[in-house]
Amino acid sequence: MKTLAFCSFKGGTGKTTLSLNIGSNLAQVSRKKVLLVDLDPQANLTTGLGVQIQDDHSLNEILRHSNEIRRAIHKTKIENLDIIPSSVLVEDFRGLDKDISLSVNHLHLALQKVQDQYDVCILDTPPSLGILSQEAFLASDYLVVCLTPEPFSILGLQKIKEFCSTIGNNLDILGIVFSFWDERNSTNSTYMDIIETIYEGKILSSKIRRDVTVSRSLLKESSVINAYPNSRAAKDILNLTKEIENKLFSDEKLVQETL
């Protein structure tokens, strides 16, 4: 099982939207078995898929007792796509953020028990760097950093890098993805070029442009490709999904080609 954390230093970067839609595309289009984990107490990923929140069958149970993962996993309406939902009780862990040493790596231990049942696990992290993000980063193989083309993006990337160093897990950045991209705005390219000089080769070529169908699909508790398959957003996210999939499974494809 390949495990990747979708992260950002602040809200409004499209992180949860990408977690939901890339997970959905991998399950439906690529026929991968996918597990989503909602680490945000706001539970937007959970509600976006129409999953009912149950405090005793959720991420809360795993963070307190890592041996309870199987009853915390819920099926979604999408074939091959399961989710570990968040709940309001997960908010309690934010109170421990000032002492990140208190984390005991429950999520990593729990996911090891189901690693043979899934091809990909996507962790949707909260827009802050504390214990919940630490749990996600320690359980992950890769990071997908979600940014918007603005000055604070550069600062956010540096904060994420410092956080990884603090917790002793220098994760490989699988890719940096830009949401709310406007190719007509020259400042978008300016910020991207600055980040490219610092993180050479890490910016993914697929950009997610503004599209109202993204928010409309969430109101329908659906992925974009299901609700609006011909939309610009569906095309952008599908291209991004293929790019991420190629990076995740490139070694396996290389082995198959040589056989």
Curated annotation (Swiss-Prot):
Taxonomy, superkingdom: Bacteria
Gene3D superfamilies: P-loop containing nucleotide triphosphate hydrolases
Binding residue positions for ATP: F9, K10, G11, G12, T13, G14, K15, T16
CDD domains named in the record: ParAB_family (cd02042)
InterPro entries in UniProt: AAA_dom (IPR025669), DNA_Partitioning_ATPase (IPR050678), P-loop_NTPase (IPR027417)
GO terms of molecular function: ATP binding
Keyword line: ATP-binding, Nucleotide-binding, Plasmid
Similarity comment text for this entry: Belongs to the ParA family.
Record PANTHER family: P-LOOP CONTAINING NUCLEOSIDE TRIPHOSPHATE HYDROLASE (PTHR13696), PARA FAMILY PROTEIN CT_582 (PTHR13696:SF52)
Protein name (Swiss-Prot/TrEMBL): Virulence plasmid ParA family protein pGP5-D
Provenance organism: Chlamydia psittaci
